[in-house]
Amino acid sequence: MKNQMNLQFSALSQNESFARVTVASFITQLDPTMDELTEIKTVVSEAVTNAIIHGYESNSDGVVYISVTLHEDGVVELMIRDEGIGIDNVDEAKQPLYTTKPDLERSGMGFTIMENFMDEIRVESTVLEGTTLYLKKHLTNSKALCN
């Protein structure tokens, strides 16, 4: 059995925390460890922030889309998508410390964090059409300390 949730919201920075908490709440039914939950929340935060800041260039008319699929075997699949400006060179964008917004004091570590916290990450992007992140994490059999 699998369970799925879809979410969409305006590309406003204040909605980043909404996305993070909503995804975390949905995932708790798999009883992840606190570390796993924190890692997934961090990844959602990074991906949504990238969509808002880079994809839509802080244009609040954009929409961020998230799909979460939970599998009975403890696999969590995330899809986070924007219809923004896209990424011209994904390999370059994934390099640690690379940022297109140094004036906004962006660290350029978003993709690095996502790659370290998730088991699989795939990025599809088309210039002027947007970017989609596909992320997968295999949860351990451990139980969370609290739900």
Curated annotation (Swiss-Prot):
GO molecular function, one term: protein serine kinase activity
GO BP, sorted A to Z: asexual sporulation; negative regulation of sporulation resulting in formation of a cellular spore; sporulation resulting in formation of a cellular spore
Catalytic activity, as annotated: L-seryl-[protein] + ATP = O-phospho-L-seryl-[protein] + ADP + H(+); L-threonyl-[protein] + ATP = O-phospho-L-threonyl-[protein] + ADP + H(+)
A Pfam family recorded for this sequence: HATPase_c_2
Keywords noted in UniProt: ATP-binding, Kinase, Nucleotide-binding, Serine/threonine-protein kinase, Sporulation, Transferase
Its EC number(s): 2.7.11.1
InterPro entries: Anti-sigma-factor_SerPK, Anti-sigma_F, HATPase_C_sf
Ranges that cross the membrane: none
Family classification: Belongs to the anti-sigma-factor family.
Known role: Binds to sigma F and blocks its ability to form an RNA polymerase holoenzyme (E-sigma F). Phosphorylates SpoIIAA on a serine residue. This phosphorylation may enable SpoIIAA to act as an anti-anti-sigma factor that counteracts SpoIIAB and thus releases sigma F from inhibition.
Stored NCBIfam families: spIIAB
The protein, known as: Anti-sigma F factor
